[in-house]
Design a protein with these regions (language model features):
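Serine-esterase "nucleophile elbow" of acetyl-processing enzymes
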Residues: 1-48, 56-62, 166
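Short histidine/acidic/glycine/proline-rich micro-motifs that form metal-
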Residues: 11, 20-21, 49-50, 73-76, ...
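Alpha-helical cap/lid subdomain in secreted, periplasmic
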Residues: 56-177
Length: 177
Protein backbone atom coordinates (compact mmCIF):
# COMPACT_ATOMS: atom_id res chain seq x y z
CA UNK A 1 0.00 0.00 0.00
CA UNK A 2 1.11 3.54 -0.76
CA UNK A 3 0.28 5.98 2.02
CA UNK A 4 0.84 9.74 2.00
CA UNK A 5 0.87 11.62 5.30
CA UNK A 6 0.26 15.32 4.64
CA UNK A 7 0.58 17.60 7.62
CA UNK A 8 2.60 20.00 9.70
CA UNK A 9 5.51 19.65 12.12
CA UNK A 10 3.83 16.86 14.08
CA UNK A 11 3.73 14.83 10.87
CA UNK A 12 7.29 15.84 9.98
CA UNK A 13 8.51 14.70 13.40
CA UNK A 14 9.77 18.04 14.73
CA UNK A 15 11.72 17.75 17.98
CA UNK A 16 11.17 20.92 20.03
CA UNK A 17 13.81 20.08 22.65
CA UNK A 18 16.80 21.56 20.83
CA UNK A 19 17.48 25.25 20.38
CA UNK A 20 17.20 24.99 16.59
CA UNK A 21 14.58 22.28 16.68
CA UNK A 22 15.42 19.25 14.67
CA UNK A 23 13.72 15.97 14.10
CA UNK A 24 13.09 12.93 16.24
CA UNK A 25 14.80 9.71 15.17
CA UNK A 26 12.84 7.63 12.66
CA UNK A 27 11.97 5.01 15.27
CA UNK A 28 10.21 7.73 17.29
CA UNK A 29 8.15 9.42 14.54
CA UNK A 30 4.56 8.24 14.03
CA UNK A 31 4.88 8.18 10.23
CA UNK A 32 7.92 5.90 10.38
CA UNK A 33 6.36 3.73 13.09
CA UNK A 34 3.33 3.28 10.81
CA UNK A 35 5.61 2.13 7.99
CA UNK A 36 7.60 -0.22 10.23
CA UNK A 37 4.51 -1.80 11.80
CA UNK A 38 2.66 -2.37 8.52
CA UNK A 39 5.32 -2.82 5.85
CA UNK A 40 3.51 -0.20 3.77
CA UNK A 41 5.27 2.46 1.72
CA UNK A 42 4.60 5.62 3.72
CA UNK A 43 5.59 9.05 2.42
CA UNK A 44 6.09 11.80 4.98
CA UNK A 45 4.86 15.09 3.54
CA UNK A 46 4.96 16.91 6.86
CA UNK A 47 6.34 20.44 6.90
CA UNK A 48 7.18 22.60 9.89
CA UNK A 49 4.87 25.59 10.21
CA UNK A 50 2.49 24.41 7.48
CA UNK A 51 -0.89 26.06 7.52
CA UNK A 52 -3.75 24.67 5.46
CA UNK A 53 -2.82 25.34 1.81
CA UNK A 54 -5.28 27.18 -0.41
CA UNK A 55 -5.09 24.35 -2.94
CA UNK A 56 -4.21 20.67 -2.75
CA UNK A 57 -1.22 19.33 -4.65
CA UNK A 58 -1.80 16.61 -7.22
CA UNK A 59 -1.41 13.43 -5.21
CA UNK A 60 -0.33 10.36 -7.24
CA UNK A 61 -3.11 8.15 -8.62
CA UNK A 62 -1.57 5.08 -6.98
CA UNK A 63 -2.15 6.55 -3.51
CA UNK A 64 -4.04 3.98 -1.44
CA UNK A 65 -4.56 6.30 1.52
CA UNK A 66 -4.04 10.02 2.05
CA UNK A 67 -3.82 10.97 5.72
CA UNK A 68 -4.34 14.69 6.35
CA UNK A 69 -3.74 16.36 9.71
CA UNK A 70 -3.66 20.15 9.57
CA UNK A 71 -5.08 23.18 11.36
CA UNK A 72 -2.95 23.71 14.46
CA UNK A 73 -0.78 26.40 12.84
CA UNK A 74 -3.86 28.13 11.45
CA UNK A 75 -5.28 28.39 14.98
CA UNK A 76 -1.92 29.59 16.33
CA UNK A 77 -1.91 32.32 13.66
CA UNK A 78 -5.31 33.62 14.77
CA UNK A 79 -7.81 31.74 12.62
CA UNK A 80 -11.02 30.77 14.33
CA UNK A 81 -11.97 27.08 14.26
CA UNK A 82 -14.64 27.89 11.68
CA UNK A 83 -12.17 29.76 9.45
CA UNK A 84 -9.67 26.90 9.69
CA UNK A 85 -12.42 24.40 8.82
CA UNK A 86 -13.38 26.51 5.78
CA UNK A 87 -9.75 26.47 4.64
CA UNK A 88 -9.65 22.72 5.16
CA UNK A 89 -12.88 22.25 3.19
CA UNK A 90 -11.41 24.18 0.26
CA UNK A 91 -8.19 22.15 0.43
CA UNK A 92 -9.91 18.77 0.66
CA UNK A 93 -12.36 19.64 -2.12
CA UNK A 94 -9.32 19.89 -4.39
CA UNK A 95 -8.10 16.38 -3.59
CA UNK A 96 -8.94 14.23 -6.60
CA UNK A 97 -8.72 10.82 -4.98
CA UNK A 98 -11.61 8.49 -4.24
CA UNK A 99 -13.21 9.75 -1.01
CA UNK A 100 -12.66 6.35 0.64
CA UNK A 101 -8.92 6.91 0.26
CA UNK A 102 -8.85 10.11 2.35
CA UNK A 103 -8.52 10.08 6.15
CA UNK A 104 -8.86 13.40 7.95
CA UNK A 105 -7.36 13.39 11.44
CA UNK A 106 -8.28 16.16 13.86
CA UNK A 107 -5.07 17.18 15.65
CA UNK A 108 -4.91 16.54 19.39
CA UNK A 109 -5.96 19.57 21.43
CA UNK A 110 -3.25 21.98 22.46
CA UNK A 111 -2.31 22.35 26.13
CA UNK A 112 -0.95 25.27 28.12
CA UNK A 113 2.72 25.77 27.33
CA UNK A 114 5.28 28.18 25.91
CA UNK A 115 3.39 28.53 22.64
CA UNK A 116 -0.08 28.27 24.16
CA UNK A 117 -0.61 30.89 26.86
CA UNK A 118 -4.37 31.14 26.42
CA UNK A 119 -7.21 28.80 27.27
CA UNK A 120 -8.92 30.18 24.16
CA UNK A 121 -6.46 28.27 21.95
CA UNK A 122 -7.15 25.09 23.85
CA UNK A 123 -10.90 25.60 23.49
CA UNK A 124 -10.44 26.45 19.81
CA UNK A 125 -8.51 23.23 19.21
CA UNK A 126 -11.37 21.21 20.77
CA UNK A 127 -13.91 23.09 18.65
CA UNK A 128 -11.79 22.57 15.53
CA UNK A 129 -11.85 18.80 16.10
CA UNK A 130 -15.66 18.92 16.08
CA UNK A 131 -15.57 21.01 12.89
CA UNK A 132 -13.29 18.41 11.28
CA UNK A 133 -15.71 15.62 12.14
CA UNK A 134 -18.62 17.52 10.58
CA UNK A 135 -16.52 18.34 7.52
CA UNK A 136 -15.49 14.71 7.03
CA UNK A 137 -19.15 13.71 7.13
CA UNK A 138 -20.09 16.38 4.59
CA UNK A 139 -17.30 15.32 2.23
CA UNK A 140 -17.81 11.59 2.71
CA UNK A 141 -14.25 10.96 3.85
CA UNK A 142 -12.88 8.98 6.77
CA UNK A 143 -12.30 10.70 10.10
CA UNK A 144 -10.31 10.12 13.28
CA UNK A 145 -9.90 12.34 16.32
CA UNK A 146 -6.34 12.21 17.69
CA UNK A 147 -7.66 13.91 20.82
CA UNK A 148 -8.86 10.45 21.88
CA UNK A 149 -5.39 8.89 21.68
CA UNK A 150 -3.77 10.37 24.82
CA UNK A 151 -1.00 12.20 22.96
CA UNK A 152 1.60 13.74 25.28
CA UNK A 153 2.75 17.17 24.18
CA UNK A 154 6.06 18.92 24.82
CA UNK A 155 6.63 22.01 26.96
CA UNK A 156 5.34 24.23 24.16
CA UNK A 157 1.81 22.78 24.33
CA UNK A 158 1.81 21.99 20.59
CA UNK A 159 4.40 19.41 19.54
CA UNK A 160 4.30 15.70 20.25
CA UNK A 161 6.86 14.18 22.59
CA UNK A 162 8.47 10.92 21.50
CA UNK A 163 5.89 9.13 23.66
CA UNK A 164 3.22 11.22 21.95
CA UNK A 165 4.39 9.99 18.54
CA UNK A 166 4.18 6.39 19.75
CA UNK A 167 0.69 6.95 21.17
CA UNK A 168 -0.39 8.59 17.92
CA UNK A 169 0.93 5.64 15.89
CA UNK A 170 -0.88 3.19 18.17
CA UNK A 171 -4.16 5.11 17.86
CA UNK A 172 -3.82 5.38 14.10
CA UNK A 173 -3.01 1.69 13.68
CA UNK A 174 -6.12 0.79 15.67
CA UNK A 175 -8.15 3.16 13.49
CA UNK A 176 -6.83 1.56 10.29
CA UNK A 177 -7.46 -2.04 11.37
Amino acid sequence: MNIICFGDSNTYGYDPRGYFGGRYDADSRWVDILAAETGWTVYNMGQNGREIPSAAPAFPDDTDLLIVMLGTNDLLQGCSPTQAAERLARFLSGVYLDRSKVLLIAPPPMTLGEWVASHRLIDDSHTFAKCCQVLAGQLGIRFANAGRWDISLAYDGVHFTEQGHRAFATGLLEELR
